Amino acid sequence: MGRKWNNIKDKKASKDANTSRIYAKFGREIYVAAKQGEPDPESNQALRVVLERAKTYNVPRTIIDRAVEKAKGGSEENYDELRYEGFGPNGAMVIVDTLTNNVNRTAADVRAAFSKNSGNMGVNGSVAYMFDATAVIGLEGKTSDEVLEILMEADVDARDILEEEDAVIVYAEPEQFHAVQSALKDAGVEEFTVAELTMLAQNDVTLPEDAQAQFEKMVDALEDLEDVQQVYHNVDLGE
């Protein structure tokens, strides 16, 4: 699959360690999920996914509780979920997911991040067809064969199960996210190193060194935007 998921997560966490930016993004996502449905993860699958993701980034309980309480309190703050698609250096493909309370601001900010870094925004559907929505679950302490056996016994399907350094990474359909986690929890897995719903590129590309440096700068500029929640792409950064 070309991605080392633990390394990607650690890199993101390290980048945001001093600014708590990642906590702010999770706070917004938790608030939106709790506001759109019940503020109880047992009856709100979207909220449960966000909370499972937040665990893998060690988001403080105070951040989570504050966001849920804000939703419970009937806050009138509303966010739109918008997706932008575009191209980076050498035609690299990028998807940007946002939560915004000001569409014009967000569109302008995203467009600027692309254009200032040798990229350009595309129209809806211009790159998304080259990505697959995927649940990615990572764990340690099991082999891929053991994980396969656990999932088979629980009658849970997975697209692929790979070993990555000390971890096992399960790739599954998005709707299987909770089923995969539940089967593994029932088998004694207490902690997940990765828990993501992502857009996975069907084919990764490798860029020349100068183009990759420009591309990473563009991704950083996009991820630094307050309204941007996730940036997906098809570039193998060698993580």
Swiss-Prot record:
It holds the Pfam family TACO1_YebC_N. It is found in: Cytoplasm. InterPro entries: Integrase-like_N, TACO1_YebC-like_2nd/3rd_dom, TACO1_YebC_N, Transcrip_reg_TACO1-like, Transcrip_reg_TACO1-like_dom3, Transcrip_reg_TACO1_YeeN, YebC-like. One of its GO terms (biological process) is regulation of DNA-templated transcription. It comes from the Bacteria. GO terms for molecular function: DNA binding. HAMAP family: Transcrip_reg_TACO1, Transcrip_reg_TACO1_YeeN. This is Probable transcriptional regulatory protein BT9727_0453.
